[in-house]
Amino acid sequence: IIQTRAINSCIQGTKPVIVATHMLESMIESPIPTRAEVTDIANAIREQADCVMLSGETTVGKYPIECVETIQRIAKRIEEEDKQVLRKDLILNLSRSKMLRSAAYLAYDLEGSLVVFTRRGIFAQKLSSLRPNVPIYAFTDKPVLFKQLLIMRGVEPFFMEFDHDHE
């Protein structure tokens, strides 16, 4: 319950949320996760965390590659089951936020994707918080922002130089 509240609070505040609590601890010594660990990962994905993170499992564990493959397989399966178009509980007060929600609905209806050009990441972050069931492609010319965009749910960042000519 506490994890769910924390995740929802972060999403409401358009803050990325990472769940990292010994996700596959048993895989430090064993090539197969416990049922409880699989359930914990599945729940974090269902609760719409931006990402789940491994730590000791990959740094000191005997099966680091299997850990990454396992968490990826679980995440992919749960995300495929998610048929929700957008988070409807997200409160949008600004007209530009409502515009982003409309764009997300349109992209979903057209089976398309969303493209954002960003120097600060605000629109990409807001779109990610809506949790649209379409890809978000974010282009930036800032290396630090590129790395920040990597952890946002549904966002695939691209680094590119922007033209500074305003014509």
PLM regions and their residue ranges:
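Helical hairpin unit composed of two closely spaced alpha helices linked by a short loop
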Residues: 1-22, 26
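Charged helix-capping and loop-helix junction motifs
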Residues: 1-4, 33-39
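Long, charged amphipathic helices and adjacent flexible linkers at domain junctions
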Residues: 12, 71-104
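Hydrophobic faces of well-ordered beta-strands that scaffold small-molecule active sites
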Residues: 17-20, 45, 52-54, 136
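Short, ordered loop/turn segments at secondary-structure junctions
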Residues: 21-32, 50, 56-60, 119-122, ...
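Conserved, mostly hydrophobic/aromatic
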Residues: 22, 44, 127
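Glycine-rich phosphate-binding active-site loops on the catalytic face of alpha/beta enzymes
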Residues: 40-64
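Nucleotide-binding motor/catalytic cores of P-loop/tubulin-like NTPases across gene-expression machines
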Residues: 123-125, 131-166
